[in-house]
């Protein structure tokens, strides 16, 4: 049964694919080329079928069905061979959107079917992506993207993924933005997943994929996952949202579409939406439980790819936004629950005029013998198959806490960038205060909503129980209507039950009105009304932030200009510092030379003095030598003089002794004195002769 169903799906999806390619066959590739959501879903459907077929005994049949599908009257396999031509000058032949889609899908499909070794897959994809880069370089089609299916990704090692990433990261002229982001995501995801216990796992058939961060729709499409696949998450991840469908297009300059999403409360889901082939199917995972610094895909314009190419942004261009507030939360799809009753002859309440809530719902039943049963009011509360559908506008009230936290985070960041003394400090503090008050008010309203919803569930169960009892009593009444007393008792019991049921309905109606007051803002002062005001206030803050961003960009441009000037000034300052250093070195060398010169000059003066002293010493030496010669020459006279001096001294001593003793006569004394005088005369003559001889020798020497 499964194989038959798969073959039927593959046949339909192959036909849809061929039709889509044929429609795009003549759309020339350019910088504005991009794939619509419908085209991306068609590609995903056929690749999913081929992936599923790998686990069956018909694994090649889906691919054969695809190959035999026709484009412009020619089988796809023949068209593919023509445009591929063994890879020779492929960029010249693959010049339209249709040819691009056919080329990429057929390459992936053939690789899924025929290759199982990672090295073989890597070799094929390396050649393939170099051809893709050549195509993107030739036509500048940066928004074109058909990523690798999960069936091939799970067979590749991280080294292979990094090498494939380098093919795009090194080809700067290729303009393959989305391919670069795709492999960057796989790289980041691998290393974050290996170091964390947090994960969100998506699986179908034989393939599965896990990630701890938000996963954009174009990556889910490339991996061929859908919202109907099995989803499992770790218990620590609380704020996880799965986007499932595009509700409508806005076609404005700010946002392209509004989407439906499901909040993942449980740890495991067997799909959160029904498996359909709708053109508006979407699948993306928003993870608000992980640190925003490691999750680069949280921004809505990056998570949900706009249909209009001009609205698409790269990571560096994306600005903070609150566009998630426009999206609608829906309950998770459960295939075990009955579907809401639609298109079963029930007239729309507003079709008959009057207030939508006050109009009774009419339902046409097949005619029978009872004229009262021909047309009667339809009450959903009496229908056991009725499942109420609650439509919530924007993020559920409990999730506004996330928006508030994010706003506070941005305000803190803005405060840090503006500085403590900035002109917006007062406005930032006021905004934080209002957010704090709004947070407290939302907590109170949330508590009240939970209480009312709990009471509503209790009342609903009681109404169902009473309805069941009334039905049983009616059956009893129809079977025992014989006018007996028991019939009267039953009728009385029925009336009492009806009255009790009416009271319960009134109470339920009041509860529903109260819930409407809080959810839909039907009266002034309701929580939804306040949320609408809060949303308007957030939009104003969004506009203010955008204005501040524009101002900041202008300031950053001025700062960039100043930085360039400062950089030039720094360059000149560096050169000036070098010149100053050189001058200082020269001044130091000059000072050293001057010191050395002064030292040399001082040494020269000292040398001159020494030379003078030396000359004086030499003169004295010569004089001493002369005197020595004189002394040597007059040594005999000197000895004679010394003898005379000795004799005179002796005589003087005798004379003195004689005088002191009073001995001798005057004659002897006179004689001695005369002798002394004679000796002194001789001594003087000797001195005179010595002096004369010395002068004579000097004159002769001269």
Swiss-Prot record:
The keyword Signal does not apply. Residues 342-380 are annotated as: Disordered. It is found in: Virion. One of its GO terms (cellular component) is virion component. Gene3D superfamilies: 1.10.287.1490. Residues 420-522, 548-692 form a coiled coil. GO terms for biological process: viral process. InterPro entries: Pox_A_type_inc. It holds the Pfam family Pox_A_type_inc. Belongs to the poxviridae A25 protein family. Interacts (via N-terminus) with protein A26. Structural protein that forms a matrix surrounding the mature virion (MV) through interaction with protein A26. Presence of protein A25 in the virion structurally prevents direct virus-cell fusion mechanism. Some orthopoxviruses such as cowpox, ectromelia, and raccoonpox viruses, form large cytoplasmic inclusions within which mature virions are embedded by a process called occlusion. In those viruses, A26 bridges mature virion with inclusion bodies through interactions with proteins A25 and A27 on the mature virion membrane. In variola virus, the protein A25 is deleted in its C-terminal region and no inclusion body is observed. This is A-type inclusion protein A25 homolog.
